[in-house]
Amino acid sequence: AIILGANMIGLMLYDLFNPAEPLKSQGKIDSRWHSLIDSLKLFGTVVIGTLCGFLFKSYLMLPTGINLYVLIVLIFFVGIQLRNNGISLKEAIFNKRGFQTGIVFTFTSLLGGIIAAFVLAMPITQGLAFASGMGWYSLSSVVLTNAWGPVQGSIAFFNDLSREIVSLFVIPLFMRHFRSTAIGITGATAIDCTLPIIQKAGGIEVTPIAISFGFVTNILPPLLLVFFSSIPL
């Protein structure tokens, strides 16, 4: 919560002092109530899916890895939309606002990790390591389990997984006025799991920001996690 809070404050300040241009791809501007409904729909879909998986696990035996293939198809169609709207791959990867959002996000994550370490009376390097996952729970949990054991690995897993869950609410609610906050709070998932949600909430024009931001937040976690977890406590 401390790391997420630091991200929110830092990214909202960035949005306030460096506001993005008004969205052009949305013909009708969504009201706050409509955005809240969209957030609840996304969260409700996750809850219903989880319940169905639990209640009907004997009947709903989906092929292993099908979620990955569905995600690949969704991202494939996002790529088609980018090209159809005249946005090149270079523009998507080297987007200035996306890169700046990634820097602000990384700095506030590490700052939040330091604050969390003081509040929870843990070593600073451990707080920095937990902050370095940036939403990449499948990576952070493995690295920190190998470094410090299953308890710390589980903490890293739930810490980063909670970011993805919070994103379901934040993206639709903040996209209109706090674009970098809406995208930045997703962390490393901006380039894969939450990319279709970002595109739906903000239109195709915000996709380059998400992709550029996602590249930053996918390159740094492996380096930072290994570095901080290798420092003796």
Regions found by a protein language model. Give the residues of each.
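Entry/N-cap segments of selected transmembrane alpha helices
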Residues: 1-7, 42, 88-114, 124, ...
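Cytoplasmic-side transmembrane-helix entry/capping segments in multi-pass membrane proteins
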Residues: 38, 67-68, 92-104, 127-133, ...
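Interfacial helix-loop-helix linkers and transmembrane-helix boundary segments
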Residues: 19-25, 35, 59-66, 83-100, ...
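Hydrophobic transmembrane alpha-helices of secondary-active transporters
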Residues: 1, 49-53, 68-91, 105-113, ...
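Alpha-helical membrane segments and immediately flanking helix-loop junctions
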Residues: 1, 126-166, 173-212
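C-terminal ends of transmembrane helices
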Residues: 13-20, 80-91, 116, 142-143, ...
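Intrinsically disordered, low-complexity non-transmembrane regions of multi-pass membrane transporters
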Residues: 11-48, 188, 192
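Hydrophobic core segments of alpha-helical transmembrane domains in multi-pass membrane transport
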Residues: 2-15, 42-55, 73-80, 171-172, ...
